[in-house]
Amino acid sequence: SISNPLLRYSYEDHFIMRLGYSFYHTNKREISPLSKALQQNFYTIRASAETAGNVLYGISKLIGQSKGDEDSYKVFGIRYSQYVKMQADYAFTHNFSDRTSLAMHVGAGVAIPYGNSSVVPFEKRFYAGGANSVRGWGVRTLGPGSFATRNSQNSFIYQCGDIRFDASIEFRSKLFWVIEGAAFVDAGNIWTIRDYADQPGGVFKFNKFYEQLALAYGVGLRMNFTYFLVRLDMGMKAHDPASGQEHW
């Protein structure tokens, strides 16, 4: 339906003029002949923030630009997006020995539309599931919240959100050559900040969000070439927060 903002904003043209900042820090030592000693603990922090549309919105107000039929300002005949998005990730690894280690990760993010936008652009919203999220679900097949899709053809449009949280813990053990085995547990989901009619159960609520955390477990193989890693994981659902589904 053209009246559906999620569906309409996912396909219509929009203009994004953004300003962003990224931060990265790690205490992991560089690999060199002088640093062969095992580093027992190391961590990595990644964070980013971006905002869009503020300069254009200020210009629109300054020149007294009139809003179009969609009650929004446009530039070059195209509606421009206005939002703020922030996210951060923390990863920690403890090496028990040169053959076994425990890796932990936690991440969160939020994206808020305002001013000239009522919905964050589709490509800027968060999604859950897949290799870098809760691995018991495929990409864009989890959430938001307890939302359960009924249309597999268009489900990816609705399975995105404005808030994300994910965490994982993974035990790794070297098997032979560059091959490592892994066992993991993942948790997480996404949510919306507004109660959209086409995403029932998707809005974030402090008294319910912990019940809507999806859980998955699984095993995998790693090919660790030191400078890069090739992964193969098999995840299983442990707790499915989708409404109408058997949760455990």
Functional labels for PLM-detected ranges:
Residues 1, 8, 16-18, 38-248:
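C-terminal transmembrane beta-barrel domains of outer membrane proteins
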Residues 12:
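Acidic, glycine-rich catalytic/binding loops that coordinate metals and/or anionic ligands
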Residues 26-28:
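Intrinsically disordered, low-complexity linker/loop segments enriched in Gly/Pro
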